[in-house]
């Protein structure tokens, strides 16, 4: 499992120009079963995406198709982790 941390590198009004395209990118990856949860940081300096995929390299290829990355309004950092413990109803996400 992975945490994708997006950090805006341009002002919010510039980021906003690509928000609809970014949302479409997110929706496509939710439909593929890759993204599990996402949302903006507070304060709004970027966003977080939790993803489930077999390899970091595959995920990097996907993230590099994000309109925020293509248009250079955001940078990203990917952190891999094992979801060893989950809340009720999320047992299917557990990894060992």
Residue ranges of model-derived segments:
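Conserved, structured core segments of small domains
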Residues: 1-96
